[in-house]
Amino acid sequence: PSFVATAAASIRKLGIPKRKVLTVHAIGGQPHVEGNDDLWILLADALKVQTLEVLVVGPDVRDRPARAYRGRVRVTHDAGAYDVANRRVWRAAPDVVIAFHAGFWGYDSWRPTLMGLLRTSIPTIVTSYTMEEARLDVRALGAATLEEGASDDACDAAAAALDLLWGPEENERAGARRVVASAPPGHDYRENNVSFCFRGRPDRGRPG
């Protein structure tokens, strides 16, 4: 599946040093994707990690205590928005955060989450259905560093100053095409079609 392949390739690209436990937080999770624990079992196999600790967070996810698989994969589900300041369900700080098809640009509710992540040095991998949506997601990150209501030009300028580990780029591991009735002519929607990765700066006011 493109979700496993994309996550594995992106985590390898980050060059995270090997460790006993790799901790991944998946934000904006959907029950049929991130909420399907098989995804994380397959990711652990793909990365060949000793232990994979996963926290799946999203308003569409139901609270569920950790479940263990094969003695090396633990997955916890937490309903609600992701807040780096609320660590009640964390077993450890994440090595990486993943946001599949998050659509930062389309939902004001993402703003507090983005503001929090931008105050940490945690790398966050983001995927989108199209290049245009990815660029809008980057703009939303820029907007999260400014006062609400900032102009698009100001948001783009702020986004240009962000620490992008890689900017929006086509993903070789993109998945199936999606038919979207409202899509503009010529727009090709595919699962995980585009990815980028950012990290914030702890000196923004909160430790990473």
Residue ranges and their predicted role:
Residues 118-208:
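C-terminal functional extensions of proteins
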Residues 1-96, 100-109, 122, 127, ...:
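Positively charged, amphipathic N-terminal segments that serve as targeting/anchoring signals
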Residues 110-115:
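Non-core capping and flanking segments associated with repeat-based/extracellular domains
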